[in-house]
Amino acid sequence: MVKVLIERIDKDLPLPNYATSGSAALDLYSRIDFELPPFKEIGGGLVIPTGIKIALPEGYLAFVLPRSGLAAKEGISILNTPGLIDSDYRGEIFVNLINFSNKTFYGKRGMRIAQLLVLQYAHVMWEEVSQLPQTERGEGGLGSTGL
């Protein structure tokens, strides 16, 4: 477990939380009521504020991910999925929702709109070589191991 500092812009909204004891990501809540027309009508997404700011420890990042239930039942996803939050970002977290359905989606303040997955990462130190070592797979990609 890692400690993450959080600032609530809107103290009436719950803190991001895990839906179950086995959940990997925390639910994020909408700070506003919103109306999200289908993508084909507006040609983009709608940026929704979550009402929180976080300070991730150095060496950690967070991904903002779609909620599977919203996607499956309503056609709602995230335009720039996954959204990446770096450890040095201190602004409010926003979610750029997109509506793939054919009907307008009406979201309510306090509804769960996305998930936040916090992960540890390592910085890369490149070592340039003239040729990479061979593997059994080689350069096989795009379904080369079967569908």
Curated annotation (Swiss-Prot):
It comes from the Bacteria. Its cofactor is Mg(2+). Gene3D superfamilies: 2.70.40.10. GO terms for biological process: dUMP biosynthetic process; dUTP catabolic process. The keyword Magnesium applies. Pfam families: dUTPase (PF00692). SUPFAM superfamilies: dUTPase-like (SSF51283). Keywords: Hydrolase, Magnesium, Metal-binding, Nucleotide metabolism. This enzyme is involved in nucleotide metabolism: it produces dUMP, the immediate precursor of thymidine nucleotides and it decreases the intracellular concentration of dUTP so that uracil cannot be incorporated into DNA. This is Deoxyuridine 5'-triphosphate nucleotidohydrolase. It comes from Dictyoglomus thermophilum (strain ATCC 35947 / DSM 3960 / H-6-12). The lineage of its organism: Bacteria, Pseudomonadati, Dictyoglomota, Dictyoglomia, Dictyoglomales.
